[in-house]
Amino acid sequence: MPTRTSLSTLAGTYPILGRPLPAVLSTVLPDGRLQSTIVWFACDRQHLLVSTMREFAKARNLRLCPAATLLVVNPDDTTDWVELRANVSLEEEGAQDLLDDIGHRYTGLRPYFGQVVPADLAATEHPVTCRLTPVAITTPPPVPPLDRPAVLSTSHTQPPPPRLPTPVGCGQDADLPADHLDLLDAPLAGALATRLPGGFPQTQPVWYAREGSDILVNTTLQRRKGRNLLADPRATLLIVDPVDSSRWIEIRADVDLSTIDAEQQLNALTRAYTRHTHYYGEIYPLDQRNLETRIIARLHPRAVHCDAIHR
């Protein structure tokens, strides 16, 4: 399981938060789906600060459901990441100054209106600060050594795996834009957002593969995202161009879960993303396959959004 750390160590424990890296902010839409977008952020003692505009969807989402998840991934090592689930307050006082500070942090330019984006946008866009107060911090779990003593399966003492949901069937798929298929066909780290039982988004890096108009992600029934999808088979996948963070594709999807050929698909992802050919035995200990049930999460796109408003 991912590890959770005391909030008192937030500033000093996570050097990644001190870097001007694009982050993924996931918020809850009125229909219960999740919106994931790229944001710039800053740290303020025990808070994270994100600047957006009063008119933007994420601000509207947060007015209705003031909970969000921020994911920051090290672009040099995608196994190094921090996920922060937070309660959010929206503040307009001082929002313009913070917007200028964050814009300068990421671009070296100020003011935001006039240097980062055209000055005339100030007439129609009104800054608001999203103050995130973390309630949970998650980091990657340590990978067990390949030569660890064999762990015996305890499946005989556990209830059988839950029955997988009935496939969602043939809904109205959203088209995947041809000019963004390069992001879907490259071995990049995607950010998969699912709903936790309490309503918070869970957003963590995943491997993925495109199969026609569907996107395939591999997980297990025992992991949190697998349990989330059993309870609510909807997810949002965000993939960002590593060269230009204003270019991205966000896919809101219905999800089918299947155990059929799940380990074979996992090995295909392993070959695409690493120098290895098999996940179990080369990345994770071989006996781990006896401790978990692999599933393919097939994402059927229902809505697709691309690119930042200002590029």
Model regions: which residues?
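A generic structural signal for nonpolar/aromatic side chains embedded in well-ordered alpha-helices
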Residues: 16-17, 62, 102, 132, ...
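Charged, gly/pro-rich active-site loop segments
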Residues: 1-7, 75, 80-175, 242, ...
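Short secondary-structure boundary/capping segments
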Residues: 14-15, 60, 120-122, 181, ...
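Amphipathic alpha-helical interface surfaces
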Residues: 13, 58, 95-98, 180, ...
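Short beta-strand segments
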Residues: 20-54, 60-62, 68-72, 81-84, ...
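Short alpha-helical
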Residues: 56-57, 77, 224, 244
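Short, basic/aromatic recognition patches
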Residues: 2-23, 164-190
